A protein has these predicted regions:
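Conserved hydrophobic/aromatic beta-strand scaffold that supports enzyme active sites
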Residues: 36-38, 48-52, 69, 89-91, ...
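Double-stranded beta-helix
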Residues: 111-140
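Short acidic-glycine-tyrosine-enriched beta hairpin
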Residues: 79-99
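Glycine- and acidic-residue-biased ligand/ion/polar-headgroup-sensing regions
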Residues: 54-57, 63-79
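A short glycine-rich, His/Asp/Glu-containing loop-to-beta-strand
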Residues: 23-60
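Positively biased amphipathic helices and basic secretion/translocation or surface-docking motifs
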Residues: 1-23
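Short beta-strand His + acidic residue motifs that chelate non-heme Fe in jelly-roll/DSBH
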Residues: 59-61, 80, 98-104
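Ligand-binding loop in jelly-roll beta-barrel domains
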Residues: 96-120
Length: 140
């Protein structure tokens, strides 16, 4: 059975932007074991999204074209810079090339804010980036 969206409590300041319980948001699958919800309030300005990552799941290896701040709302994750649990904030920029992995036994729920796009790296990143370039060239 596929796990449903997370049901973690959300900090009060964030609840006003969501407008509904976290379990009722329009979560979009990103890859197996990972979903996201883009906060429409910030569309076109900054990348502000919620990420839900199943325990043990690794995100694709990536770096950053700008600054990323990630607040852990539930669960935990780790990368080469350390371990992050509920309430921790991780920062990353163009000097960081990492592959965060969700830990623990519960979904890792994070609020991620990016002022520029991520850039996938490693072999899988090269394949995905090449496919995205081809789609742009053929207009899809």
């Amino acid at each position: 059975a596929r796990p449903g969206p997370p049901v973690a409590p959300v900090p009060e300041p964030l609840r006003g932007y969501l407008g509904k319980p976290i379990s009722e948001l329009g979560w979009m699958p990103v890859m197996a074991g990972m979903r996201e919800y883009q906060l429409p309030e910030f569309a076109g300005r900054a990348g502000v999204r919620l990420l839900a990552i199943e325990p043990g799941r690794r995100m694709p290896r990536h770096t950053h074209e700008g600054l990323e701040l990630t607040l852990v709302l539930q669960g935990s994750f780790a990368d080469a810079s350390g371990d992050y649990a509920k309430g921790d904030v991780a920062t990353a920029d163009a000097s960081v090339d990492h592959q965060p992995q969700a830990g623990g036994r519960e979904v890792c729920l994070c609020l991620a804010i990016e002022d520029a796009p991520l850039k996938l790296t490693g072999f899988n990143g090269m394949v995905i980036n090449a496919a995205a370039t081809v789609r742009k060239l053929v207009g899809r």
